């Protein structure tokens, strides 16, 4: 009898701990009409958003489009003050502008942008002048110039060159880590002077392999967090590329959740395990951001069901907010997150052509 009771207790205990704990809903507000645009200026898809030490907001938009529908040039970098008032455009008609991807601000308030179309990373100083250039776009006069062609298998990666580059981040020593990107499926590391140091990664789904490393961030210890979007995970490495761990975000989805665009993904368990590209799977990280020290947390966004997740750096989900949609406090494919503090974040949305400034209620 005693043995039976012990077995029953152990079984019940195992059952309890096997259940997913409820993730708290984070309460938040979106500042209405945050960005004040001049009458003749319009945003396109907002691919990037960043905030500097003065709380100035930088928006990397696929506005100012020129050229044909396919292969158009679509990139415009704009600066706003802390209250959202327009200040200036940076890099008007810049040679590297092709298809905006992300913008970041380093600890010295330099601006860094990645352009997926030109395969280039550009560093601007605080005055908005070009300070450093990485990569090179194809020459318009080359007979073989064909930016929309994807050779199969892809051509081997080349040091110092990128293919559809996605994001940048830095360590305390000033080394830059570049996620490269849709085709090369690797992380590159360059020193503070721009010298190429190393790269790691290749296409695949094993540790240290990537399916679109789409966003990148570093913590205060110098660990590198890579949003491996197509594999629905965040991989964590040391500064030399040694794999440390991976994080997956598994929060139940409301059966009534709607996609921001397109068909609703089929999440039926009867379909078997998800295979192949998981970009639209719940929890797949499109953008990640780590708050400043000393108490660092990470934010991650997905395309469906359009949520933002707040996590510890070891991957515990602390809370969740948002859903897909077109109204304030709803999201249409968050492509980049800026998180200057734990309870103030900025999101750039592709489908809604906007930036939202979100004020989160502190945890109790």
Model-derived regions: residue spans:
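Bacterial N-terminal signal peptides
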Residues: 4-15
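Eukaryotic scaffold repeat domains enriched in small/polar residues
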Residues: 19-364
């Amino acid at each position: 009898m005693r043995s039976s009771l012990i077995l029953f207790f152990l079984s019940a205990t195992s059952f309890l701990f096997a259940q997913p704990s409820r993730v708290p809903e984070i309460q938040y507000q979106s500042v209405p009409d945050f960005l004040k645009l001049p009458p003749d200026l319009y945003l396109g898809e907002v691919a990037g958003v960043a905030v500097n030490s003065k709380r100035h907001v930088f928006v990397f938009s696929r506005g100012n489009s020129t050229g044909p529908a396919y292969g158009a040039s679509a990139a415009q970098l704009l600066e706003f003050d802390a209250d959202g008032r327009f200040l200036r455009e940076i890099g008007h008609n810049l040679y590297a502008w092709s298809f905006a991807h992300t913008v970041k601000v380093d600890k010295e308030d330099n601006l860094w942008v990645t352009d997926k179309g030109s395969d280039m990373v550009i560093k601007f100083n605080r005055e908005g002048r070009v300070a450093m250039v990485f990569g090179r776009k194809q020459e318009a006069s080359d007979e073989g110039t064909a930016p929309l062609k994807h050779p199969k298998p892809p051509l081997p990666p080349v040091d110092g060159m990128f293919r559809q580059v996605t994001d940048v981040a830095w360590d305390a020593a000033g080394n830059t880590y570049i996620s490269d990107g849709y085709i090369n499926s690797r992380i590159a590391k360059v020193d503070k002077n721009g010298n190429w140091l190393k790269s790691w990664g290749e296409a695949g789904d094993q540790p240290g392999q990537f399916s679109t490393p789409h966003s990148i961030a570093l913590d205060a210890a110098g660990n590198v967090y890579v949003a491996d979007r197509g594999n629905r995970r965040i991989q964590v490495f040391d500064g030399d590329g040694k794999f440390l761990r991976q994080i997956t975000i598994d929060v139940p989805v409301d059966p009534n959740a709607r996609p921001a665009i397109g068909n609703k993904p089929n999440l039926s368990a009867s379909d078997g395990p998800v295979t192949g590209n998981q970009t639209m799977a719940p929890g797949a990280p499109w953008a990640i951001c780590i708050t400043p020290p000393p108490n660092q947390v990470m934010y991650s966004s997905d395309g469906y069901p359009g949520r933002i997740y707040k996590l510890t750096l070891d991957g515990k989900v602390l809370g969740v907010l948002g859903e897909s949609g077109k109204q304030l406090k709803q999201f249409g494919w968050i492509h980049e997150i800026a998180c200057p503090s734990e309870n103030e974040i900025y999101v750039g949305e592709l489908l809604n052509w906007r930036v939202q400034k979100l004020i989160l209620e502190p945890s109790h």
